[in-house]
Amino acid sequence: MPNSQKICIIGSGLTALTIAYLLSKFNLQIDIVEQDLKKKKIKPTKLALSKHSFDQLCSYGLKDIKKKSNVVKNIYLHDSYSSISLKKDLEFSAPNTKEALAYIIDGNILFSDISKKIKSFKNINFVKKEISSINDNKFYKEIIFKDLTKENYNLVIFASANNLFLLSKFKLRKVIDKLYNEDAYVFNLHHKKIINNSARQFFLKDGPLAFLPVSRTETSVIWSIKNN
């Protein structure tokens, strides 16, 4: 039986679709609102999911992602402020060899799998409209679209990096805006087949450098470098 609660999710990227997918299991009526609903181009980013988050997605019907991901069994942290050193300063390991600390998966693969699932859900509706204003009433949130149509929602979730100007339409009690003054460089390295189940992070003078094991033949490198 459908739930009478109605949810609006602004955005149609991976974060928005994941939220919609998980909430759909409660039979909520969900509108995914985005002015441009063309095929999303997800950046070639590899995602690290905690074991708990990964298990949750699998339990909600995304079991196929298990064979499309790589297990992380060890995480090594290196205090290499002056130069890269393989001396391990801190190590995290799974309780036993059969368990995982985390999983690495391609963002595009996860996005595609969730998109396919969502298309078959009758309680999720895609709305291709531009939002004009968001009004906070006592019992609901009213969204007015540019075509002057209105919709009332019990909850509005903002999950869009493309419509940041809409944040000003939310009456937020507190907004935290932090500038890190860093640029992140991502490299996907393809190499010969190895046992690749360990993640490493080096804390360098110019910023942290991380190695994520994507598969036995691929490693993702992320280097966050200070702008100065």
Where do the model's predicted regions map?
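Extreme N-terminal starter segment of soluble prokaryotic enzymes
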Residues: 2-7
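Glycine-rich FAD pyrophosphate-binding loop
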Residues: 8-10, 22-45
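N-terminal Rossmann-fold NAD(P) dinucleotide-binding loop
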Residues: 16-17
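Rossmann-fold NAD(P)-dependent oxidoreductase module
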Residues: 22, 117, 188
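N-terminal FAD cofactor-binding segment of flavoenzymes
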Residues: 43-80
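Conserved N-terminal helical subregion
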Residues: 70-169, 178-182
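Conserved FAD-binding catalytic core of PHBH/FMO-like flavoproteins
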Residues: 159-228
